[in-house]
Regions:
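N-terminal Rossmann NAD(P)H-binding glycine-rich loop of SDR-like oxidoreductase domains
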Residues: 3-23
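SDR active-site strand-loop-helix element
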Residues: 6, 52-56, 97-103, 148-150
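Rossmann-fold NAD(P)-dependent oxidoreductase module
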Residues: 15, 19, 86, 134
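Conserved glycine-rich Rossmann-like NAD(P)H-binding loop of the short-chain dehydrogenase/reductase
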Residues: 26-32
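NAD(P)H-binding glycine-rich loop region in Rossmannoid oxidoreductase-like domains
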Residues: 34-82
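Conserved Rossmann-fold NAD(P)-dependent oxidoreductase catalytic core, especially the SDR/UDP-sugar
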Residues: 81-122
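Catalytic helix-loop patch of NAD(P)-dependent Rossmann-fold dehydrogenases
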Residues: 110-147
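NAD(P)-dependent short-chain dehydrogenase/reductase
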Residues: 125, 139-141, 146-183
Length: 183
């Protein structure tokens, strides 16, 4: 199995890459420089990959200046559009395109599932809506498309490891009012 993977240095994708390699699957990392290539050249790089996994995107745990909001948006939507364009030009198209998304599409008023369409009306929800729309364009070229709406991802070296020192020093405090959801 040959898999092409964006966001290869990220938290989730670096873990996934190791899982794929342990199964003796060939992993082709798609780096930022590769995304600057023309769609045709990117298609050549990933040609023959049976699965394309798109986990690219700037880290949302930073200060959201107007400039950084643009980076958050472009690193997801532009990357996804470029990948779909490249897949359309591949001589051997992938069977599956898996793209990340986020639970930030939902408002904070209840419990939601994948068939709910009562989305939030904020900047993060706009990013997610546009991101999913860009990913689902792969269906137009007959590629099975799967979108995962990630919430907080917990794992070794992740968010909790960064928060723990403050809590150990007694500076962590209560997070929220205790009634908020955790996804």
């Amino acid at each position: 199995m040959q898999i092409a993977l964006t966001g290869a240095t990220g938290f989730v994708s670096s873990y996934l890459a190791n899982v794929f390699l342990e199964k003796d699957w060939k992993v082709t990392p798609i780096l930022r420089d590769d995304l600057a290539l023309s769609s045709k050249d990117l298609a050549k790089k990933i040609d023959g990959s049976g699965v394309i996994v798109n986990l690219a995107g700037a880290n949302i745990v930073k200060r959201w200046t107007e400039e950084y909001k643009k980076e958050l948006y472009n690193s997801r939507i532009d990357t996804t559009i470029k990948l779909v364009e490249a897949m359309g030009q591949m001589s051997r198209k992938p069977k599956i395109f898996i793209s990340a998304s986020a639970v930030g599409i939902y408002d904070d008023r209840g419990r939601y599932g994948e068939s709910d369409y009562n989305f939030a009306n904020n900047y993060l929800a706009k990013i997610v809506k546009d991101w999913e729309e860009a990913a689902f364009r792969a269906r137009e070229i007959n590629i099975r498309t799967i979108v995962f709406r990630f919430g907080v991802v917990l794992g070794k070296g992740g968010l909790l490891a960064k928060m723990l020192p403050s809590f150990k020093l007694g500076m962590g405090g209560t997070i929220g009012n205790g009634r908020q959801s955790f996804s």
